[in-house]
């Protein structure tokens, strides 16, 4: 028998497979019979972890959270570093596209974020990222060849921003302001 694990919006798509639909991570956790707090991963990796457990549940009728938690995420993928004075810096330099940056922002949406953005966007529209930043507590530090474009978008979306040109300038500016309850995110 074939099985399809799909987001709820696709549950009614015609298929011969048995459909397991989920709305969010909580739905998958219920299907797997696990507690979300027992899983070592956070957004955006939490959904992937739960999908892996769901496949294990389907194939072997078990969900080994302890084994799952031994998996190590590659360096520079939302890698949290706590510096002296208890301040959190997040290295997400593997986020090479808009979607990855959006997921990083979602992970820290409940914190004030000092967000370093920039580089060569290769002409890709950044509007979707800025749409996701609206309403969040965030300040942008624009670096790289597209820093002027980022500053214009920040103004358009009414998001505080500082043009820093290079990474070291952005880090220095953030270091002056970063509080222990806030996040410095390089994405």
Model-predicted segments: where are they?
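Nucleotide phosphate-binding/pyrophosphate-handling subdomain across enzymes
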Residues: 35-137
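Acidic-glycine-rich active-site phosphate/pyrophosphate-binding loop
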Residues: 18-35, 74-80
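Short beta-strands and strand-loop turn motifs
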Residues: 7, 185-187
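Short, aromatic/basic amphipathic alpha-helical patches
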Residues: 10-19, 151-157
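A short helix->loop->beta-strand "cap" motif at the edges of active sites that frequently abuts
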Residues: 1-2, 16-19, 136-138, 159
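Short internal beta-strands
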Residues: 2-8, 114-117, 136-145
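Flexible active-site lid/hinge loop adjacent to a nucleotide/diphosphate
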Residues: 1-13, 21, 25-28, 36
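C-terminal helical cap/extension that packs against the catalytic core
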Residues: 26, 30, 126-182
């Amino acid at each position: 028998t074939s099985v399809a694990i799909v987001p709820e919006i696709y549950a009614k798509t015609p298929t011969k497979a048995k459909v397991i639909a989920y709305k969010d991570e909580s739905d998958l956790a219920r299907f797997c019979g696990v507690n979300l707090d027992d899983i070592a991963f956070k957004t955006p990796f939490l959904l992937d972890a739960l999908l892996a457990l769901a496949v294990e549940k389907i194939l072997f009728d078990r969900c080994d959270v302890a084994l799952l938690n031994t998996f190590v995420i590659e360096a520079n993928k939302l890698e949290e570093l706590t510096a002296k004075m208890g301040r959190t810096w997040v290295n997400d330099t593997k986020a090479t596209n808009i979607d990855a940056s959006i997921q990083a922002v979602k992970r820290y949406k409940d914190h004030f974020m000092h967000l370093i953005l920039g580089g060569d966007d290769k002409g890709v529209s950044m509007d979707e990222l800025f749409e996701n930043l609206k309403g969040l507590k965030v300040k942008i530090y624009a670096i790289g060849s597209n820093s002027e474009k980022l500053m214009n978008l920040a103004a358009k979306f009414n998001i505080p921003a500082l043009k820093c040109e290079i990474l070291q300038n952005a880090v220095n500016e953030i270091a002056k302001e970063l509080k222990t309850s806030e996040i410095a995110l390089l994405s």
